[in-house]
Amino acid sequence: MLYLSVPELIAEAANFVPAIKDAGVETTFERLSSIQDQVLVVKYGGNAMTDEALQQQFAQDVALLTAMGVPVVVVHGGGPQIDAMLKRVGIEGQFVQGMRVTDADTMGIVDGVLCGNVQGQIVNLINQAGKSYGVRAVGMSGKDGRMVRVKRMHLPDVQNPEIEHDIGLVGEVIGVDTALIENLLDGDFLPVISPIAADDQGVTHNVNADVAAGEIACAMHANKLMLLTNIKGVLDKQGELIANIDSASATALKADGTLYGGMLPKIDSALDAAQRGVGAVHIVDGRVPHVLLQCLLTDADVGTAIRV
């Protein structure tokens, strides 16, 4: 079966993003050339997972990028879906510094929701969006192929690091074996990874999706890591977007309470990845239509760039 050429794929992308059409094929091809054959890790979560139009747009974006020669690895969350299932069975979800407190009952639900319904839906959407491009998505978790190894996390308090919070079966990543991911990419498959992993005793743990994405990006020596969120990016106290952030400014924003909740593991993962050599790290607004194509193939400033 014959698939579309790169110029034809760029024309497809231009149907979704007017700025690509405005820039023209030659300029867009130059931008694309700078990211082809270099791994892109995307953390997919938040509203982009629950809004049907945004779901379709995300699938179209990763399918097009893959067809254009960008090796894409998707690591997904599923907080809204987990919360809905916990509510259905009468369990109240709890969080400490953006990390889900995970007892044994909660772990079973998290595992089932992420590795079942959520992952299956993402894989199906990408396969449908990419079938005319020859793109094939495959779902797995961090347990498959012993890809992600963890130990039980004891979370230091953000204000007083001498205090540690026991948050249950939440995994701290101690190793990533990239062999399975690399084999899939070499076979022209698009890996979709649920952030579930096991410790050395085989006990299943929940891993924060931002953390998992960052660790996988580092292990893969990724060119780019993009963390999708429900807001414009990292915001200051006035709710204005911070275009660039580094470790020193992030530490100050944590200390004064500007950064809190789910943004804490996100910013920590982003800074860690940038410091460990991931080429470019961005926290971007997953509510923006076709945000991946906009960030990668146009000069649009969407979200917050992480600086070392």
PLM-predicted stretches and their roles:
Residues 1-287, 294-300, 307-308:
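Nucleotide/pyrophosphate-binding catalytic subdomain
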